[in-house]
Amino acid sequence: MQKLESRGFILFNRNYRENDKLVKIFTKQAGKRMFFVRGGGSGKLSAVIQPLNIAEFMMTVNDEGLSFIEDYSQAESFKEITSDIFKLSYATYLAALTDAAIADGVVDAQLFAFLEKTLVLMEEGLDYEILTNIFEIQVLDRFGVRLNFHECVFCHRVGLPFDFSYKFSGLLCPNHYEEDERRSHLDPNVPYLLDRFQGLSFEELRSISVKDEMKRKLRQFIDELYDNYVGIHLKSKKFIDNLNSWGHIMSKEDNAD
């Protein structure tokens, strides 16, 4: 058991017994921990323990069992995200993906900073779909998946119209397409963008602009990568998959009003 002060991100909370809450917090100093909050639905902590909030927490951290929040300060929320069903859905997915990417108790300050900055940019109005794609690609290594979208897996040439091979877990240049008759037949811009996504700085994110058709192709291929190499199926991702169809219906109804 140790007393600790750390910045923390609320991943989720759930009811526990009658009036209490269990709260999963990704802390910068102690990794992901489950916290017990007595009277969580109506007590002092009720506002700060809502998903996607960030604060400085004073806490008691236990290596085994539940940890406890003693106090908090500097609470922040993402008002633009939580007021938009689309942004909220994507942000919730990023939180769930973060939860899946590392084990509880593993300190990962770099991932914490990346998640926080991604949500800050989403809050500022940057493209939430592309921000999500970039996050998905850069977090792959947390699942033990390391893919090279920069060069041909055979001759290591760069800057060519590449395709992806699951057989070789890498790119094929035109001279080596025949090495895999079941290659992906991608639009060459897909691996080009994924190569950029792997190394983008936060400032470069502000200048990224991708057309809708290319977004669709990126979404399809990244889904295939996760199916083939990661194998997780998150409820929040399934919700996003259905979002465009019923979201379009909602939009039509709003226009009718």
Swiss-Prot record:
Keywords: DNA damage, DNA recombination, DNA repair. It comes from the Bacteria. GO terms for cellular component: bacterial nucleoid. GO terms for biological process: DNA recombination; double-strand break repair. NCBIfam families: reco (TIGR00613). Belongs to the RecO family. Involved in DNA repair and RecF pathway recombination. This is DNA repair protein RecO. It comes from Streptococcus thermophilus (strain ATCC BAA-250 / LMG 18311). The lineage of its organism: Bacteria, Bacillati, Bacillota, Bacilli, Lactobacillales. The gene is recO.
